[in-house]
């Protein structure tokens, strides 16, 4: 089939690579978000998908809005059979959805109808799910509500951050997306409506969502830190300044600390929660590089019992 691939961040690149490597489908063009400022100099930089497409000699379309008439006209000229989508980053209007003969097929990083929305991986970790996966579905105007072509499952490991899990899902999902394109072309793959039960929503994680509440249980604190790593980054407050929490580990045997209270050993830093303590392993103070929590604690000379979050 002739395809137009829509995607923007690094997590979409494995799927683009898989479609190119399949040899069965022609990726005639790529649709991605416009160049964005990046780095200290805030220079405009093309998206990872745009960079990969340019390396492969594929036409790149960067509409400010996917309803722009110039973009729609070019899409009609290309006349794609299907448009696979991975983390494009903009809502597609009905006029665009109607152009490809077989519609737009999205690779979503959850087992739909669970975790519809922008941050399914973060929410699955923060909720304590043990299994997640990826789904391919036909895009409709509703939020991730279209009928599903196929799924692949992935175990959530106890130490997974959202970055770890998303990387694995990006590669597992790329194979699923290629298989879905093959099935659509053959006419043998039928999309199945999502069940009405089991719908959960996964809105974008805000900075406030990433603020750690030390009165919650240790397992919840651990899940928030892992779910918000690498972005937006879990955080707390220490001596009036924000402290980023990069890695913690629950310590069930430490039940002597009040929520938010610090305890410093020779090479360990513990914090009380609503259940038992967690050990801080890696942190990042404002304006500083990430460092081991024990090194940070020595540098700021913590007093036992000093609070976090105040």
Curated annotation (Swiss-Prot):
InterPro entries: Fmt, Formyl_trans_C, Formyl_transf_N, Formyl_transf_N_sf, Formyl_transferase-like_C_sf, Met-tRNA-FMT_C, Met-tRNA-FMT_N. It is an enzyme of class 2 (transferase). It catalyses: L-methionyl-tRNA(fMet) + (6R)-10-formyltetrahydrofolate = N-formyl-L-methionyl-tRNA(fMet) + (6S)-5,6,7,8-tetrahydrofolate + H(+). Its EC number is 2.1.2.9. (6S)-5,6,7,8-tetrahydrofolate binds at residues 110-113. The keyword Ribosomal protein does not apply. The keyword Protein biosynthesis applies. One of its GO terms (molecular function) is methionyl-tRNA formyltransferase activity. Keywords: Protein biosynthesis, Transferase. Pfam families: Formyl_trans_C (PF02911), Formyl_trans_N (PF00551). Gene3D superfamilies: 3.40.50.12230. GO terms for cellular component: cytosol. Belongs to the Fmt family. PANTHER family: METHIONYL-TRNA FORMYLTRANSFERASE, METHIONYL-TRNA FORMYLTRANSFERASE, MITOCHONDRIAL. Attaches a formyl group to the free amino group of methionyl-tRNA(fMet). The formyl group appears to play a dual role in the initiator identity of N-formylmethionyl-tRNA by promoting its recognition by IF2 and preventing the misappropriation of this tRNA by the elongation apparatus. This is Methionyl-tRNA formyltransferase. The lineage of its organism: Bacteria, Bacillati, Actinomycetota, Actinomycetes, Kitasatosporales.
């Amino acid at each position: 089939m002739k395809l137009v691939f829509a995607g923007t961040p690094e997590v979409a690149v494995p799927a683009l690579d898989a479609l190119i490597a399949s040899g069965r489908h022609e990726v005639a063009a790529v649709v991605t978000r416009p160049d964005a400022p990046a780095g200290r100099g805030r220079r405009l930089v093309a998206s990872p998908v745009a960079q990969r497409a340019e390396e492969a000699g594929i036409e790149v379309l960067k509409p400010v809005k996917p309803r722009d008439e110039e973009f729609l006209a070019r899409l009609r000229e290309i006349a794609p059979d299907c448009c696979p989508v991975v983390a494009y980053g903009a809502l597609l209007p009905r006029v665009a959805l109607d152009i490809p003969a077989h519609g737009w097929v999205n690779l979503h990083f959850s087992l739909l109808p669970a975790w519809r929305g922008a941050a399914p991986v973060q929410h699955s970790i923060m909720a304590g799910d043990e299994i997640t996966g990826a789904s391919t579905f036909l895009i409709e105007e509703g939020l991730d509500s279209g009928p599903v072509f196929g799924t692949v499952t992935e175990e959530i490991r106890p130490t997974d951050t959202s970055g770890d899990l998303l990387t694995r899902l990006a590669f597992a999902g790329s194979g699923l997306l290629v298989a879905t394109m093959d099935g659509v072309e053959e006419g043998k793959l039928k999309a199945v409506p999502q069940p009405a039960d089991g719908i959960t929503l996964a809105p974008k994680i805000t900075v406030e969502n990433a603020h750690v509440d030390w009165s919650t249980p240790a397992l919840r604190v651990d899940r928030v830190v892992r779910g918000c790593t690498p972005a937006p980054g879990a955080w707390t407050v220490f001596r009036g300044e924000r402290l980023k929490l990069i890695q913690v580990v629950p310590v069930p045997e430490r039940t002597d600390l009040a929520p938010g209270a610090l305890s410093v050993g020779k090479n360990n830093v513990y914090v009380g929660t609503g259940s038992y303590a967690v050990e801080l392993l890696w942190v990042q103070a404002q304006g500083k590089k990430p460092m081991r929590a024990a090194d940070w604690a020595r540098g700021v000379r913590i007093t036992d019992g000093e609070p976090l979050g105040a």
